[in-house]
Amino acid sequence: MPELENKFQVIVSKRAAQQLVEHAVFMARLEERLARQLAADFRKAADSLQSFPYRNPILRSSVFVTEKYRKMVFGKWYLLIYQIKGERVFVEYVIDGRQDYQ
């Protein structure tokens, strides 16, 4: 009997897409391969949210005061910030974890 698995719809906000582009442009100045790898890592992370998006911890922060957001690390130090509403996962932010976003 095949295993039944919930599939969540993942929606990337314009803001998150723009933040990803900004990070990739910066990395491309250093080495184009790094920018391509960042984009691939983001796709893999976002795609993985289709299954088990609750596996990542709730984001506790003075900036994000409500506990509606979750965080997922991808690449070496980037954070994918998202929230779950019903069967949809909304990717809201892409943050460089080395920077103080607090």
Locate the predicted segments by residue.
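Short, flexible helix/strand-to-coil boundary loops that buttress conserved ligand/catalytic motifs
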Residues: 24, 53, 95
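Basic/aromatic recognition patch in beta-strand/loop cores that engages polyanionic ligands
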Residues: 54-86
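Structural signal for well-ordered, non-membrane alpha-helices
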Residues: 24, 43-50
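Enriched for short, Lys/Arg-rich terminal
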Residues: 3, 74-102
